[in-house]
Amino acid sequence: MASTRPSSTATKTKAPDDLVAPVVKKPHIYYGSLEEKERERLAKGESGLLGKEGLKAGIEAGNINITSGEVFEIEEHISERQAEVLAEFERRKRARQINVSTDDSEVKACLRALGEPITLFGEGPAERRERLRNILSVVGTDALKKTKKDDEKSKKSKEEYQQTWYHEGPHSLKVARLWIANYSLPRAMKRLEEARLHKEIPETTRTSQMQELHKSLRSLNNFCSQIGDDRPISYCHFSPNSKMLATACWSGLCKLWSVPDCNLLHTLRGHNTNVGAIVFHPKSTVSLDQKDVNLASCAADGSVKLWSLDSDEPVADIEGHTVRVARVTWHPSGRFLGTTCYDRSWRLWDLEAQEEILHQEGHSMGVYDIAFHQDGSLAGTGGLDAFGRVWDLRTGRCIMFLEGHLKEIYGINFSPNGYHIATGSGDNTCKVWDLRQRRCVYTIPAHQNLVTGVKFEPIHGNFLLTGAYDNTAKIWTHPGWSPLKTLAGHEGKVMGLDISSDGQLIATCSYDRTFKLWMAE
């Protein structure tokens, strides 16, 4: 068969104009050394053809390229992108292998443990579950296990922190506890016997007596008003015989006034700053000599001073407090003195032994007020941490935790019936607690501002007195806790209050620098 291969002459046939390819001039390739050419070029440059001016002209013409030295490695950039793509691919692969709970609450808990928002706007359970899966694919499932272990460790540390621990007290503390036990048990028996006798009184007689008392309380009026100092009066307290009233002032002075005519008897000088409280000894003006210690006071600088009735100077100073002492209270026996301090503790002092026998901690913030049970067996404290505590002085244990107030507790008091406790707080309420049931039995919405003090009627506890920063004091029935009378008359905050031992007089002191006596008509 004949070959159809075209001859060489066929390539020389003339093609159409539109198919003619442009002729490309091939560059010349030179072989060998360029030394001679370079010498010629340099020789011409020395003659001025390519000198500095020629170099400058070449740069301006763009024939000579001057670079900054920056180099962009294309291969390195491509490798980084490839690494990112591979990492994302591996992450998605891990995400598909991670098992996530279908319980939405558990998914939220896991997100919270990882420090992520538990929900986003418009996010449903499925999207939330997928978001958790993506987070775990980045941080790893071990992160969730680690957070759970940390939570368990923190719980264990909290449990260890909440364990009871003890201070080793002095031998005098043991002696004092035995003494308090021997003192309180007979008084408790006497109180219970009086309660039995009171219960034997016919119901009609008791009801009529209560009605007469309520009628008398409703007729209370301002009997006397006296300007007590140039600065606000922070505290007032009746003497046991109800013939004197002690007031504490922000000027650092303590004053004694006659009752009921309100004449100034003594001015006690010794404090250099705001006095927080001054209280009479339980046996002062009754069986105690005037030269003995009849009063105790405390101030914001941590000083606690003891006073007699025949001198304007303090008899002794109780040293040991380094920060503010808010309140001071006598034990019913008169042998011990309790102080509350802003160092989150309260202390018990034995004045016969002249030493501190108990430094009790337990509050997480400063302790503001303290009260003793009339038997002498218990102490109640109210703190700025919004909690109250009841302590058994015979064993040192906290027997009741008063939890329920929303703000600081500024006042606490025991009822003469032996089982009711009242607390006043910065949340404007007064709560009544039952020692037998160990719970709050009633919450009184007492005032429109913080409650500064609470006080039970000292004989039978038939009514409750409260004072507050709304410039009023109020009287409440016991046990009904209904309002009986509002004592309005102060132009400033009511900062302190007290009821005389015979129950006939009520005293209130105020930020307006006055104290007032209230008596039934």
UniProtKB/Swiss-Prot annotation:
Superkingdom of source: Eukaryota
Q: Which residues carry this modification: N6-acetyllysine?
A: K26
Compartments annotated for it: namely:
Nucleus; Nucleus speckle
Keywords attached to this Swiss-Prot or TrEMBL record, sorted alphabetically, are: Acetylation, mRNA processing, mRNA splicing, Nucleus, Repeat, Spliceosome, WD repeat
PROSITE patterns hit by this protein: WD_REPEATS_1, WD_REPEATS_2, WD_REPEATS_REGION
Assign the protein's first listed, main location to one coarse class. nucleus
What GO molecular function annotations does the UniProt record carry, in alphabetical order? U4 snRNA binding; U6 snRNA binding
CDD domains reported in the protein's UniProt record: WD40 (cd00200)
WD repeat intervals: 229-268, 271-318, 321-360, 363-402, 405-444, 447-487, 490-521
Q: Which GO terms describe its cellular component?
A: nuclear speck; spliceosomal complex; spliceosomal snRNP complex; U4/U6 snRNP; U4/U6 x U5 tri-snRNP complex
* Pfam families in UniProt: PRP4, WD40
Biological processes annotated in GO = mRNA splicing, via spliceosome
The entry's protein name is U4/U6 small nuclear ribonucleoprotein Prp4
How the protein assembles, per its UniProt entry?
Component of the precatalytic spliceosome (spliceosome B complex). Component of the U4/U6-U5 tri-snRNP complex, a building block of the precatalytic spliceosome (spliceosome B complex). The U4/U6-U5 tri-snRNP complex is composed of the U4, U6 and U5 snRNAs and at least PRPF3, PRPF4, PRPF6, PRPF8, PRPF31, SNRNP200, TXNL4A, SNRNP40, SNRPB, SNRPD1, SNRPD2, SNRPD3, SNRPE, SNRPF, SNRPG, DDX23, CD2BP2, PPIH, SNU13, EFTUD2, SART1 and USP39, plus LSM2, LSM3, LSM4, LSM5, LSM6, LSM7 and LSM8. Interacts directly with PRPF18, PPIH and PRPF3.
InterPro entries from the UniProt entry: G-protein_beta_WD-40_rep, PRP4-like, PRP4-like_sf, WD40/YVTN_repeat-like_dom_sf, WD40_repeat_CS, WD40_repeat_dom_sf, WD40_rpt
Q: What does this protein do?
A: Plays a role in pre-mRNA splicing as component of the U4/U6-U5 tri-snRNP complex that is involved in spliceosome assembly, and as component of the precatalytic spliceosome (spliceosome B complex).
